[in-house]
Amino acid sequence: MSGHLGRVLQFHLRLYQVLGFHGLPLPGDGNPARTRRRLMAWSLFLLISLSALVLACLFSGEEFLYRGDMFGCANDALKYVFAELGVLAIYLETLSSQRHLANFWWLHFKLGGQKTGLVSLRSEFQQFCRYLIFLYAMMAAEVAIHLGLWQFQALTQHMLLFWSTYEPLVWLTYLRNLQFVLHLELLREQLTGLEREMGLLAEYSRFASETGRSFPGFESFLRRRLVQKQRIYSHVYDMLKCFQGAFNFSILAVLLTINIRIAVDCYFMYYSIYNNVINNDYYLIVPALLEIPAFIYASQSCMVVVPRIAHQLHNIVTDSGCCSCPDLSLQIQNFSLQLLHQPIRIDCLGLTILDCSLLTRMACSVGTYMIYSIQFIPKFSNTYM
């Protein structure tokens, strides 16, 4: 990575380096090639260590899995297995997608993402406000629920062993999800900037149309600006493709891991309540309930900007006395076709679009799962044995 990053962005990218999620050296790192090799070796070490931890938990004779009944044991094993799936996807993709990630940041700097002057810390916080709220709200909620839970819940050996090994996997999954959000916020920033500039062009043309005041070469000016905006949009579209190339598999794995955890914990919550088992640790799914909406909100926020750009594009006046320009109309049509053929569409390997309708489908799937559990759990009671 070349260029200069703001302090907020630099700090959080450094955090992702420590977690093994970001394998590129940051601006200012000495000997970038050696730093890259060390980061990749660190990611590989974390992958092997965490995978060994999960295998040890699954096959150890200690109480990492719930031993009270096979149902609880299977639930804990399922959470470990899908957490391992998420870990594999995260670190293997980190190791294999360096080129896509490097291209993403190169395009970001090319579009003006580097801070050439002194930018106040307050401005940086405002720029990444939504990402910072998602990140630190999740961290605060997770810590607060843990601190509150263990004041009322007896800490058995099983709970100590399970949560001391499973909770790090949960945090890695959450932080990877918020890494997606950070990159989507950078995409959204470029798109909203383009929308503002298109709005200014529409205002210029409308003012010229209503007042009859313009300057020689006004048509050429508008056309040049439109061509420039088309190039910017093309670079933003390339950023999207690089984002998908860098994170596609781990997006699917992380969302699946979080969704499976929610479904399993909801199932086990009803099972515990039905069998009068005192177990309050299912409250720990509350942060998980916020993770998927946070990512989908960031994804949806990117995708909804493109129709607004198209709206501003078609607000440019071309049929007034001062700028009755067939060439300008043709340029607008060309840009419109570009928006149509290069859509900002964020999906999981082409399987499903990551918009708000996905939340509805996931809620329905968990609801269906709970309906089946309500019908089948009585069959596990002694009267049916």
Curated annotation (Swiss-Prot):
Q: Which Pfam families does this one have?
A: 7tm_7 (PF08395)
Q: What GO molecular function terms would the record report?
A: ligand-gated monoatomic ion channel activity; taste receptor activity
Q: Which stretches are Cytoplasmic in the membrane topology?
A: 1-38, 91-131, 176-248, 306-347
Q: Where are the transmembrane segments?
A: 39-59, 70-90, 132-152, 155-175, 249-269, 285-305, 348-372
Q: What is its main location?
A: membrane
Q: One biological-process term from Gene Ontology?
A: response to insecticide
Task: Name the domain of life this protein comes from.
Answer: Eukaryota
Q: Tell me which UniProt keywords the record has, alphabetically.
A: Cell membrane, Membrane, Receptor, Transducer, Transmembrane, Transmembrane helix
User: What does UniProt give as GO cellular component?
Assistant: axon; dendrite; membrane; neuronal cell body; plasma membrane
When the coding gene is removed by deletion, what phenotypic consequences does the entry describe? Answer: Leads to an inability to detect L-canavanine.
Segments on the Extracellular face: 60-69, 153-154, 270-284, 373-385
Q: Where in the cell is it found?
A: Cell membrane
Family, per entry: Belongs to the insect chemoreceptor superfamily. Gustatory receptor (GR) family. Gr2a subfamily.
This one is known as Gustatory receptor 8a
Gene for this chain: Gr8a
